[in-house]
Curated annotation (Swiss-Prot):
UniProt-listed SMART domains: EFh (SM00054)
TM helices/strands, residue ranges: none
Residues binding Ca(2+) 1, per UniProt: 15, 17, 19, 21, 26
Annotated organism of origin: Schistosoma mansoni (Blood fluke)
CDD domains found in the cross-reference section: EFh
UniProt domain EF-hand: residue ranges: 2-37, 38-69
Protein name: Calcium-binding protein
Record GO terms (molecular function): calcium ion binding
Keywords, ordered alphabetically: Calcium, Metal-binding, Repeat
C-alpha cells in the first residue's frame, strides 16, 4: 500500500516542470518510458476521472487516491 510520503515522492519524480502537479503530458512521458504508451485522449480521460479540483492535473492527494483505491 502506498502512503502519502511515497505518493509525494512519485509526484516529485513525475513532475518535470516542478509545478507540484502531474499534467497529462508528464504522465504520458512517464508511461512511454516504462514501455506503456497510451493515447493522449486516454491519459486525459484518466486524469479527468481522478482530478477532484478540476484543474486538469493530479496533485499529491489525487495521486494518493488513485494509488490507494
Amino acid at each position: 500500500m502506498v502512503n502519502r510520503t511515497e505518493a509525494a515522492q512519485l509526484l516529485k519524480h513525475l513532475d518535470r516542470d516542478k509545478s507540484g502537479k502531474i499534467s497529462s503530458q508528464e504522465l504520458m512521458e512517464f508511461l512511454h518510458t516504462v514501455n506503456c504508451p497510451f493515447k493522449k485522449e486516454q491519459v486525459e480521460k484518466f486524469i479527468k476521472q481522478h482530478d477532484k479540483d478540476g484543474d486538469g492535473q493530479l496533485n499529491t492527494d489525487e495521486l494518493l487516491d488513485v494509488l490507494c483505491s
